């Protein structure tokens, strides 16, 4: 998170907005985790239907999505936390340990899926930071234009921000 926060400041988002939105986003803006929960739950429900013949109706699926929206707010910032929320919620909606068996199928690829969830969560938080800075009228368009170019270090030196200029030169 510190590297992402520094990158958002270098992009032109004020430090006070970065300091509020990024940490808050890691608790409440978990786009990647919600996408995983939605797709995985439908996969497990379809696998359970093939096994038991019991169809999960639209109303039950919508109720399950609402449950995921509530339970995902308590996700910890640790690897593979989403799989535990998936397990707990699926056991509520599916009979006789079918949820656990479905989650067991996903465990084989969860390490890769977790990297994808983390990347989507990070991109969502960075996007939210930029959107809020623009909304507040405090986004620095000039800084964004030179972000990641050699001109960024020159702009930092002219504004007296030696630390950012050094970070640009080192490639951080």
Task: Say what each PLM segment does.
Residues 16-30:
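Membrane-water interface at loop-to-transmembrane-helix junctions
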Residues 7-10, 142:
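Selected transmembrane alpha-helices and immediately adjacent juxtamembrane segments
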Residues 32-35:
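Transmembrane alpha-helical segments and their cytosolic interface motifs
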Residues 38-172:
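Transmembrane alpha-helical segments and their short flanking loops
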Residues 2, 6, 19-22, 42:
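Internal, well-ordered alpha-helical scaffold/interface segments
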Residues 1-8, 114, 125:
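Short helical (or helix-break) motifs at transmembrane helix termini and adjacent helical loops
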Residues 10, 27-30, 50, 92:
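Conserved helix-loop functional segments at active or binding sites
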């Amino acid at each position: 998170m510190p590297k992402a926060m520094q990158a958002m400041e270098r992009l032109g988002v004020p430090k006070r907005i970065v300091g509020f939105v990024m940490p808050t986003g890691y608790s409440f803006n978990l786009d990647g985790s919600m996408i995983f929960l939605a797709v995985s739950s439908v996969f497990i429900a379809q696998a359970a239907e093939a096994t038991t013949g019991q169809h999960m109706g639209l109303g039950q699926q919508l109720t399950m999505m609402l449950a995921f929206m509530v339970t995902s707010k308590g996700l910890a910032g640790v690897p593979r936390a989403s799989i535990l929320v998936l397990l707990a919620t699926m056991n509520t909606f599916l009979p006789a340990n079918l949820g656990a068996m479905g989650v067991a199928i996903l465990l084989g690829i969860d390490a890769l899926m977790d990297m994808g969830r983390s990347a989507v969560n990070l991109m969502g938080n960075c996007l939210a930071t930029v959107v809020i800075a623009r909304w507040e009228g405090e986004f620095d368009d000039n800084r964004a234009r030179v972000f990641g170019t050699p001109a960024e270090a020159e702009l930092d030196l002219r504004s007296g921000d030696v630390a950012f200029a050094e970070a640009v030169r080192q490639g951080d």
